[in-house]
Amino acid sequence: MAEETQHNKLAAAKKKLKEYWQKNSPRVPAGANRNRKTNGSIPQTATSGGCQPPGDSATGFHREGPTSSATLKDLESPCQERAVVLDSRSVEISQLKNTIKSLKQQKKQVEHQLEEEKKANNKKQKAKRVLEVQLQTLNIQKEELNTDLYHMKRSLRYFEEKSKDLAVRLQHSLQRKGELESVLSDVMATQKKKANQLSSPSKAGTEWKLEQSMREEALLKVQLTQLKESFQQVQLERDEYSEHLKGERARWQQRMRKMSQEICTLKKEKQQDMRRVEKLERSLSKLKNQMAEPLPPEPPAVPSEVELQHLRKELERVAGELQAQVKNNQRISLLNQRQEERIREQEERLRKQEERIQEQHKSLQQLAKPQSVFEEPNNENKSTLQLEQQVKELQEKLGEEHLEAASQQNQQLTAQLSLMALPGEGHGGEHLDSEGEEAPQPMPSVPEDPESREAMSSFMDHLEEKADLSELVKKQELRFIQYWQERCHQKIHHLLSEPGGRAKDAALGGGHHQAGAQGGDEGEAAGAAADGIAAYSNYNNGHRKFLAAAHNSADEPGPGAPAPQELGAADKHGDLCEVSLTSSAQGEAREDPLLDKPTAQPIVQDHQEHPGLGSNCCVPFFCWAWLPRRRR
């Protein structure tokens, strides 16, 4: 298939060359006309304007024998060379397309990995929130247990006081028993004495008194046994409550240990995620650097109409993608607009930086006025590098502030957990002894830590400030792009309006035609248009990379802006000139008197046929000036 397309292209190119030479060649005898139609070559001199020198015309009239075959061979050789150049150019274009497809696939893979990492981070944040809810429930349960413990302590105090009262009553009863026994012994002694003294009728009264005393003693023994049993029950209940409290303390300590272990695992996972994100960012930066490397410029060839149409379709598609990316960036910037009161300090810093950037722009404009057109990209490269350094510094500051806030939050959470995990054993017997003398006071409820709330609120404020700063960084990058567009417009207008040979050189720099200024203008314009389209595809890829880097500037350490590298590569080659297809340049070119020249008309006609090419942004065409090769 590729060979057939190449043969078709060669046949079409030969037909066009024959038609061109049939139109522009002067009327000569039949032998000379046949030679020119078969060869389809270009005149040798650039000043003749498509006409052969008189010597050659004379040889064409008088020499038709062996010299005609030599002229045919001489005219066929450049056609064969151009066919070979066309073949090599098509192969190179296919290779470039394959590289672009592979880079797009790599970009999609990296974006897919980033999305997976974001999903994992979201899951971890959800788990963190669940843990915070569990911590709150544990705090509530701890408060409830503290209230239960307070009530238990009060009941224990009540039972202890009751047991003390019973012990006092026992002591009094024992004392009374001893007294009664002593009294009984005295009574028995007195009764024996009286029995010895008195007669038998007095013995009945004494026996009755003895029975009463025995009954009282039995009642007292029953009361003593009851008091001992109640005292033992109180002691058993106290032991059971103490064991229950010890078990609850052990459970709480185990729970706090588990929570601390889970927090440690979460910290480790967070560190691993940060490392993965750093690795992905490094891989992205490497890919961007690889994509941003400028391709070595090669001499353009004369493209066919099919290639031109294909390139125009690609340009329209790339322009549509650029418009979609710009719209997406605008939507993201609109969604990320938040409160302005919290970023006053950051706005002041950014204002200072903007003032510096404006001063740099003014100095660049002042320096660019006396200099030539080809020395201006150096100053613009310096300004773009300074802007990139400022954006990188801002992003590094944002990353450092985010890490500091996260470390502070982790420290506060660990401090809270350590305070909650402290055992309450130091408030045991002393607390009971002190409260036994004083009136019982209600147990205060455990208040929530206000420092944790302040830390969470400050962390959320910091996240919002980070989002606002990322928006401001995007705005600065968009301003830089607009400034670059304006500079391109100025350069193009300067090139179009400049009198002399530069406009001609810019128009003539696209092809390998060796025709003069009058006879070969159409072929040269076609070559310049083909070179411009090839250069636009390279620039469009770089511009797309720059927009993607601006879109991902909030998540990555540094934006990959390939525009300065492309400019640096352009400065190294030296003899570059820019051609634009924007609407403003078109309007200025219509009023320009240079459009009367045939070299500038095909470019304007191409832009009128495809107006969508200049709708998005400035599209500079870096074209080589092949005048030295023509002169050779």
Curated annotation (Swiss-Prot):
GO terms under cellular component: cis-Golgi network; Golgi cis cisterna; Golgi cisterna membrane
Start-end of Gly residues biased regions: 508-520
Pfam family, one: GOLGA2L5
Comp. bias intervals (Polar residues): 38-50
Keyword S-adenosyl-L-methionine in annotation: no
Keyword field contains Coiled coil: yes
Keyword annotations of the record: Coiled coil
UniProt-listed InterPro entries: GM130_C, GOLGA_cons_dom, Golgin_A
Compositional bias of kind Basic and acidic residues: 352-362
Stretch list, region Disordered: 1-77, 352-384, 422-456, 505-524
Superkingdom field: Eukaryota
Coiled-coil ranges per UniProt: 86-154, 209-421
Disulfide-bonded cysteines: none
Gene Ontology BP terms: Golgi organization
Family from the record: Belongs to the GOLGA8 family.
Protein name listed in UniProt: Golgin subfamily A member 8M
